[in-house]
Every structure is written in structure tokens, then in C-alpha cells.
């Protein structure tokens, strides 16, 4: 049985976007599921789109996500070079082989002629297609133009009748009328190959058995097949993945400023959660389970379970999944990751590990942390209206009564520990013979100035310390007295 060999072939044009990362992940999983090789190849034939630093982003993303390649530009391998701009002589050699076979030809048409063809097709409302003008040139005319250094491209010579059929693992057999196939350019006038031609040549020479790409490339597949046939090469297994949508009508796109992998990490998502979520954008394991580490994905992944229908990128679902990963983190690890976010809003020397105990089960993404914690550093200005809670049966009057009762008890409390704070509050509840909320709601409001907080009255009082707790409760009493007109 032939060893499975897949390739991830990104262009160094900027950040690693979600669609690119999904292609990398599926390509990796297909190879590793069958004990095969995962190859990294850099497609930089469009030099105008090259972005400085983009190559480092590709390497870094693959490294931190655990998608370790077996061959590539940085580690070498038996079928290099693995950067297309270093393989231009190879492409030209194979393009000339196609010319010799009558499957490709030189095209010397000027930009002006090409523009007039496009304009004519636009006027007649037909799709643009090259008219094979240069196919009619004699050998002598071609040699004369080459000797005169007239700029040229090399075009594929596609038939104008009949059908080309190709098989895709997701979409099945697809037939295309050959009259719809343009004679696509194989070698550009700058000597660089087009994306399409370089792909076919490299996939063959590198022994690629499975090709994963987006469904937008389905329309190019017949032209790829005709190239494979022209060379007499075996066609790889095609796996065209459905698009990732922003919503029901709009594709997720870097052109629209949608999040890249790097953006998500900077927003506080965990790389493991992002990778897990991306795996499910178009694929499912056939059961209800949704949380998988990379090893589990390798074991379970079957490309035949990829869907045809577009996948919606659901930020709510991603946040939920990230929260599940947060909960599973060891406390020390979560604390280390959260510390930079704590320090954005907390300048005091508090016990951050205690804060992490509260947050780890409540936070979904790390970037939410500052807004959840600012009250630990400084009591925000707040309205006494938040002391009123229908379910807790609290109002301004009984809230003031509670705070005035708890203040002297807190003053006498020693040592100031979580257990003692809890006992002190629960003793007051028993003494007053009221429900917990009558005491705990106003105490928590006075300590935090917020309706919603990570942790309750006991934990907040413990973390901010005795002096700060007393100061805040005294301030709460003062506010409530002012509200009632009792000075």
C-alpha cells in the first residue's frame, strides 16, 4: 500500500487565517491517521503578495498548535526545495515538455489584445476565455519571437469539445464541458509558474497522495486533471472542504477583517480550544462528543465524514469550548496565563492564586478578565439601586440594617480568613433568622459595587483583606444613609 503523503502549502501573505489553519489541520490528520508524512511547502510564486514576516508566522503557528511537519523548508527532506520560488527551473522544464506533447503552447499576446478580448466578452455577456490565437503560430514564428525576446506566457492547451470528469471524496464525480475550460496560464511572463501549474508539478514530484483544499477550487480541478493526464501521472485523491461562513450569507474572509489564528490567541483563546473548534468546522466524528485533543483527532479523523454544506463560524460556541478548556487547566497554569490580565487592572499586592480559583470555572476567554476584576483594585462608583433585589428580598432599608450589623462583627474578627468570614456571616443569618440573601447580597454589593462578580461575599472579603473590607462596608452604610436621608 502506498504511504499517505499530504502537504500544507500556504502562501506567505500575512496572518494564518481560520480557513488556512483548518486546511493544515485536516491535511495533518489525514497523514497521521494512517502513519503518513505531513509536508510543508511554501507557495510564493505570486511575489507581489509576499509579506515580510509571514513565513515566520506559518512556522510559529504550526509549532504551537502541534502540527509538526516531517519535511519542509526549515528541516529539509528528500524532495526539496520546499519553496516554490526556488523551483522555477523545474516548472519551466515541465511546461516545455507539455509544449513538445502539444498540450501547451507559447502565447505572445500583448496586454492590449488581452484587454480587448475581455472587453468583447463583457459586452457580449460571455465568460472570458482566451481564443487560442497563438496556438496557430508556426514553429518558425515562435522561434523568431523567442529570439527577439518578445514577452510570452505558456498556456495549457485544453480541448473545446467533450467532457472532463474528476472525482472528489466529498462532492463525488463532477463532469465539466470542455468548452468551459480556459487555456489557463502555466508559466507567467516573469518566468514564475502560476499557482495551479506549480501545484500539479510539485504534488507529483513530492509524491502527494491526498490533496486538501477549499471547495472554491472545484472549478479548477478539471484543468488539473488534464495536466495529470497530459503528463501520464496518477491523479491524487481530492478532498475539497466546504467554505467557512461568517453567517448564512457571508464567507469568513481575511479581506473582511475576520479573525486570524493569531487574533484569537491575542484575545485570550487557548490554542488547543481553537484547534479543537476548527476541526469541527465541516467535520464530525459521528457522535455527540465535541472536546478532543490532537491525539484523539488523529485517531478518529476520517475525511469521508467531512460535510458538503458550509460551516458557520460560531463565536458563542468557540467561547463555550474555550471555557471548557479553561476549566480543565491546572490552577497554577491558569494563574500564570491570567496574571498579565490581572495586572492590567490590579496594582495592589493581592493573592492572585485565590482570584484564579474563582475565575478558572467562570471565565471563557482570558480577555474577559479585566472587566470582571477591576473592583478588587478599587471600589467603583455605584448606585444604591443595586442593593434592591426582588428574589433576595433585599431593599435599601434591610440592606442598611445588615451592613450596620455585620460591621462590628467584622471589626472584631481575627484572624481574617475565608472560614472565619463565612462563619461570621452565617452566624448573623442565624441570629436574624433570615434567608442567606438578606445578608449576603448587601455585603457582596458593598464589597464589590457590582451586581455580578466572580465569587461571593466571603471570597471577596478574604481577597481584598480586612481593612479594605471594613472601609467599603462603611462607605456602603454612608451611601445608604444618604439615600434614606438619615445622616
Curated annotation (Swiss-Prot):
What InterPro entries does its record include?
aa-tRNA-synth_I_cd-bd, aa-tRNA-synth_I_codon-bd_sub2, aa-tRNA-synth_I_CS, aa_tRNA-synth_I_cd-bd_sf, Glu-tRNA-ligase_bac/mito, Glu/Gln-tRNA-synth, Glu/Gln-tRNA-synth_Ib_cat-dom, GluQ/Sye
Q: Which reaction does it catalyse?
A: tRNA(Glu) + L-glutamate + ATP = L-glutamyl-tRNA(Glu) + AMP + diphosphate
State the span of motif ('HIGH' region): 10-20
Enzyme type, top EC level:
ligase
Name any one GO molecular function.
Answer: tRNA binding
Show the GO cellular component annotation of the record: cytosol
Q: What is its EC number?
A: 6.1.1.17
Q: What is its main location?
A: cytoplasm
For this protein, the record's Pfam families field holds: Anticodon_2, tRNA-synt_1c
The record's subcellular location field reads:
Cytoplasm
Disulfide feature: none
Q: GO:BP terms for this protein? A: glutamyl-tRNA aminoacylation
Keywords of the record = Aminoacyl-tRNA synthetase, ATP-binding, Cytoplasm, Ligase, Nucleotide-binding, Protein biosynthesis
Where ATP binds, per the record, is at 254
Report whether Signal shows up as a keyword of the record. no
Keyword Nucleotide-binding assigned to the entry: answer is yes
What the protein does? Catalyzes the attachment of glutamate to tRNA(Glu) in a two-step reaction: glutamate is first activated by ATP to form Glu-AMP and then transferred to the acceptor end of tRNA(Glu).
Subunit composition and interactions:
Monomer.
Annotated family: Belongs to the class-I aminoacyl-tRNA synthetase family. Glutamate--tRNA ligase type 1 subfamily.
Give the protein's recorded name.
Answer: Glutamate--tRNA ligase
Instruction: Please give the organism.
Output: Clostridium kluyveri (strain ATCC 8527 / DSM 555 / NBRC 12016 / NCIMB 10680 / K1)
* High-level lineage: Bacteria, Bacillati, Bacillota, Clostridia, Eubacteriales
Amino acid at each position: 500500500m502506498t504511504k499517505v503523503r499530504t502537504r500544507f502549502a500556504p502562501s506567505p501573505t500575512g496572518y494564518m487565517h481560520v480557513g488556512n489553519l483548518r486546511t493544515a489541520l485536516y491535511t495533518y490528520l489525514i497523514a497521521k491517521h494512517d502513519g503518513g508524512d505531513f509536508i510543508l511547502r511554501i507557495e510564493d510564486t505570486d511575489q507581489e503578495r509576499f509579506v515580510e514576516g509571514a513565513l515566520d508566522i506559518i512556522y510559529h503557528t504550526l509549532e504551537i498548535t502541534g502540527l509538526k511537519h516531517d519535511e519542509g523548508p526549515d528541516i529539509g527532506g528528500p524532495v526539496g526545495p520546499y519553496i516554490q520560488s526556488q523551483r522555477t527551473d523545474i516548472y519551466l522544464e515541465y511546461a516545455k515538455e507539455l509544449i513538445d506533447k502539444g498540450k501547451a503552447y507559447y502565447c505572445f499576446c500583448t496586454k492590449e489584445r488581452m484587454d480587448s478580448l475581455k472587453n468583447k466578452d463583457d459586452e457580449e455577456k460571455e465568460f472570458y476565455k482566451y481564443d487560442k490565437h497563438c496556438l496557430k503560430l508556426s514553429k518558425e514564428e515562435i522561434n523568431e519571437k523567442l529570439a527577439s525576446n518578445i514577452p510570452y506566457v505558456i498556456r495549457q492547451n485544453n480541448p473545446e469539445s467533450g467532457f472532463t470528469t474528476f472525482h472528489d471524496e466529498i462532492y463525488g464525480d463532477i463532469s465539466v464541458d470542455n468548452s468551459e475550460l480556459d487555456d489557463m496560464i502555466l508559466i507567467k511572463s516573469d518566468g514564475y509558474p502560476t499557482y495551479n501549474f506549480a501545484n500539479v508539478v510539485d504534488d507529483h514530484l513530492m509524491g502527494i497522495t491526498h490533496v486538501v483544499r477549499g471547495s472554491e477550487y472545484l472549478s479548477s480541478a478539471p484543468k488539473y486533471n488534464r495536466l495529470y493526464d497530459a503528463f501520464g501521472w496518477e491523479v491524487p485523491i481530492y478532498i475539497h472542504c466546504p467554505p467557512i461562513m461568517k453567517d448564512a450569507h457571508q464567507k469568513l474572509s481575511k479581506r473582511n477583517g475576520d479573525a486570524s489564528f493569531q487574533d484569537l490567541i491575542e484575545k485570550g483563546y487557548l490554542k488547543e480550544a481553537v484547534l479543537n473548534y476548527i476541526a469541527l468546522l465541516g467535520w464530525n466524528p459521528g457522535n455527540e462528543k465535541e472536546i478532543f485533543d490532537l491525539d484523539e483527532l488523529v485517531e478518529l479523523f476520517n475525511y469521508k465524514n467531512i460535510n458538503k454544506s458550509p460551516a458557520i463560524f460560531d463565536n458563542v460556541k468557540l467561547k463555550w469550548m474555550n471555557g471548557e478548556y479553561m476549566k480543565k487547566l491546572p490552577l497554577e497554569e491558569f494563574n500564570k496565563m491570567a496574571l498579565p490580565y490581572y495586572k492590567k487592572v490590579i496594582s495592589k499586592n493581592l493573592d492572585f492564586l485565590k482570584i484564579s480559583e474563582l475565575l478558572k470555572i467562570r471565565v471563557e476567554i482570558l480577555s474577559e478578565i479585566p472587566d470582571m476584576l477591576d473592583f478588587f483594585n478599587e471600589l467603583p462608583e455605584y448606585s444604591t439601586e443595586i442593593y434592591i433585589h426582588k428574589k433576595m428580598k433585599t431593599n435599601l432599608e434591610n440592606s442598611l440594617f445588615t451592613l450596620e450589623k455585620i460591621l462590628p462583627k467584622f471589626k472584631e474578627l481575627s484572624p481574617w480568613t475565608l472560614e472565619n468570614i463565612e462563619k461570621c456571616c452565617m452566624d448573623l443569618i442565624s441570629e436574624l433568622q433570615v434567608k442567606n440573601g438578606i445578608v449576603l447580597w448587601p455585603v457582596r454589593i458593598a464589597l464589590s459595587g457590582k451586581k455580578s462578580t466572580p465569587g461571593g461575599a466571603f471570597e471577596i472579603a478574604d481577597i481584598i483583606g480586612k481593612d479594605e473590607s471594613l472601609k467599603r462596608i462603611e462607605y456602603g452604610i454612608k451611601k445608604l444613609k444618604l439615600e434614606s436621608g438619615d445622616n
